[in-house]
A protein has these predicted regions:
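Residue-level recognition of well-ordered beta-strand positions that form the cores
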Residues: 49-53, 66-68, 97, 101, ...
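Short acidic, flexible loop segments centered on an aromatic residue
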Residues: 51-74, 79-81, 167-188, 193
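Short, solvent-exposed loop/edge segments of extracellular or virion-exposed proteins
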Residues: 26-36, 142-150
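Short, solvent-exposed loop/linker segments at the N-terminal edge
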Residues: 35-44, 150-158
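Intrinsically disordered, low-complexity Pro/Gly/Ser/Thr-rich segments with frequent PxxP/GP/PP motifs
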Residues: 75-106, 188-220
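Terminal connector regions
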Residues: 1-20, 99-137, 215-229
Length: 229
C-alpha cells in the first residue's frame, strides 16, 4: 500500500520463465483535469498513464495492452495502450493514457480493480491493480432548537430556528452542496429559503452549520413529536 495515494498494489507471485520477456504492471499515474488532488473522486473524469515492468531476461517490443474492469462504478472509454520497448529489468511508461469516468454514486474508499492483458503478438501476460475511489459521506449531529420567544419551549403557533452540524466524514470534498429539510408532520412547516443552506464547498473532515426556519401550527397538540428529514 502506498500511504496517502489510494493505490493498492496486489501481492501476486509470478512464476517467471528463465528465458524471454515477462511484462507486469508496475505503477499508474493519475492525470486530472479538474480537482488535481492526487486521488480519484466521485463523478470525476480522468486519465491513467500506466507503467509496466519487464521482469524477464529478454527485452520486449511493440507491446499492446488492454485495460478492463468489471466494476460497476467505473467506465473505461478507451482501454488500449502501447509500449514501444521494455528492456529486461526495466520499466516504461505507456505511449498513451486511458480515459476513465467514476460514477457519482461510488461509495467512499471503494476499491476498483483493473485487469490488464499485455501482448507482443507472440506472448501474452496478465496483471492487475486497484485504485480506491473517494466520495463525501454526510452526517448530521447536535440539533439545537431556538424558539421565537426564547423560553426554551417550542409552543403551538410559534416559529423556531434549528441549528444542525453538517459533517462530511468522507475522504472527498463536495462542491456546491445544498442541505434541505422536510417535515413529516402535519403540524410543522419548514419555511427556510431554498438557498439558505447552499455552500461553496464542504471539505473532507469538516463540519459546517446548517440553519433551518420552521413554524408550528396553532392547533399543534401538546407534546407532539415532529419527524424531520
Amino acid at each position: 500500500i502506498m500511504p496517502g495515494s489510494g493505490i493498492n498494489k496486489t501481492n501476486i507471485v509470478n512464476v517467471i520463465s528463465p528465458e524471454g520477456a515477462y511484462i507486469v504492471h508496475e505503477n499508474v499515474v493519475l492525470i486530472e483535469s479538474a480537482v488535481g488532488n492526487g486521488q480519484i473522486d466521485f463523478g470525476e473524469d480522468l486519465e491513467l498513464l500506466l507503467i509496466a515492468e519487464n521482469v524477464g531476461v529478454d527485452g520486449a517490443s511493440n507491446i499492446n495492452a488492454t485495460v478492463t474492469s468489471s466494476d460497476p462504478y467505473v467506465t473505461i472509454e478507451n482501454g488500449d495502450i502501447l509500449f514501444d520497448f521494455i528492456g529486461p529489468g526495466l520499466t516504461s511508461d505507456s505511449n498513451n493514457s486511458i480515459n476513465i469516468s467514476i460514477a457519482t454514486s461510488v461509495p467512499d474508499l471503494h476499491p476498483i480493480t483493473f485487469d490488464i492483458q499485455y501482448s507482443n503478438g507472440t506472448d501474452t501476460w496478465e496483471s492487475s491493480f486497484n485504485l480506491n475511489a473517494h466520495a463525501p459521506v454526510f452526517e448530521i449531529a447536535n440539533p439545537v432548537v431556538h424558539d421565537e420567544n426564547q423560553d426554551g419551549i417550542w409552543d403551538p403557533g410559534e416559529s423556531a430556528t434549528i441549528l444542525i452540524d453538517l459533517i462530511n466524514s468522507g475522504s472527498s470534498d463536495f462542491h456546491y452542496p445544498t442541505a434541505s429539510m422536510v417535515s413529516n408532520s402535519d403540524y410543522i412547516e419548514v419555511t427556510t429559503d431554498d438557498n439558505t443552506n447552499t455552500f461553496y464547498v464542504i471539505f473532507s473532515g469538516s463540519t459546517y452549520q446548517g440553519e433551518f426556519q420552521l413554524n408550528s401550527d396553532a392547533e399543534t397538540p401538546d407534546g407532539t413529536i415532529a419527524s424531520l428529514t
